[in-house]
Amino acid sequence: MNEKGFTLIEMLVVMLVISILLLITIPNVTKHNQSIQKKGCEGLINMVQAQITAYQMDHDGKTPNRAELESEGYIKKNLKCPNGKAIKISNGKAQAD
């Protein structure tokens, strides 16, 4: 018998190597995903803060609330961070809730 193919031992070794690679890779992907969502939220807050400033410049320094920014098209309605946190505007400052 001179059949070519993988033995059971060879298949087990391959499965072990793949499992180890997955154990190393998955936690890193999760960690980077959380970091990306946090930075995305920070960027969105900065954008909303810039829109608050633009509104104030257009309206003689009046501090807007969220409804005013949404109704005049400065920001989209129901704007949320990538991680699901809502954007809150208080005293002219944007922050994640």
From Swiss-Prot:
It holds the Pfam family N_methyl. It is found in: Cell membrane; Cell surface. It is a single-pass membrane protein. GO terms for biological process: establishment of competence for transformation; protein secretion by the type II secretion system. PROSITE patterns: PROKAR_NTER_METHYL. InterPro entries: Bac_GSPG_pilin, ComGC, N_methyl_site, Pilin-like. Keywords: Cell membrane, Competence, Disulfide bond, Membrane, Methylation, Transmembrane, Transmembrane helix, Transport. Its main location: membrane. SUPFAM superfamilies: Pili subunits. Disulfide bonds join 41-81. Residues 1-5 form a propeptide. The modification N-methylphenylalanine is found at residue 6. GO terms for cellular component: cell surface; plasma membrane; type II protein secretion system complex. Required for transformation and DNA binding. Homodimer. This is ComG operon protein 3 homolog. It comes from Bacillus licheniformis (strain ATCC 14580 / DSM 13 / JCM 2505 / CCUG 7422 / NBRC 12200 / NCIMB 9375 / NCTC 10341 / NRRL NRS-1264 / Gibson 46). The gene is comGC.
